[in-house]
Amino acid sequence: PYSSVDENGNYVGIDIELATEAFNRMGYQAEFQMIPWEEKARLLAEGSLDCLWSCFTMNGRENDYEWAGPYLYSRQVVAVRSDSQIYALKDLEGKRAAVQATTRASGVLLHEIASPVPQLKQVNCFSTTEELFAALRKGYVDAIAGHEAMITAFVKGGNGNYRLLEESLYVSELGVAFEKGTHRELAERLTETLKAMEADGTITRIVEKYGLDAAKVV
């Protein structure tokens, strides 16, 4: 629910609406591009993009970018098939999982950062959420992991075939990333604009429109 393209080719989602409103308040018109997420650093460095705004976690990357935010908080969670014998993170030991490449969930499952999960048999990294969901639907993996809103939407649309684990993988702060050493003033202005949007209820209204609990994420 953060950013996607609908059947009419329009960009939709929480981040799309937040970015549009924030930049409008600052006197800019937001333009959006969908990119292969693993190429984000290159595209930002070469100037093909001005910023990254797509459910992007600040934790552990504080010194890698010029940041605006945090503007939302997100849990990283795990989903499994309803008939799975996986009920807790410890049950993932020796199992196969799928994540989106270069995300916080991938870092946790690959033990690149502090991780509450045991060693898995296999971690598959995909470019898109569609590939991620298909891997679980087709039984290629035992579990998938990612941002709570994204995984919850998948589970809710799964006709009872999937469920969430109660435990969180990780709690992350979401921010807007600009290339390090550039746009510092713009990032600071954006942070102040986002704070104003939180104070006047705009962020709450937008996230609740997409089914999120504002008390947990704002």
Predicted regions: what is each one?
Residues 73-80, 156-195, 213-218:
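Periplasmic-binding protein-like
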Residues 4-7, 19-29, 105-126, 155-159, ...:
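Ligand-binding cleft/hinge of the Venus flytrap
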Residues 22, 44-45, 92, 136-137, ...:
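Hydrophobic residues within well-ordered alpha-helices
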Residues 2-3, 12, 90-106:
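Short loop->beta-strand "edge-of-pocket" segments that line small-molecule binding or catalytic clefts
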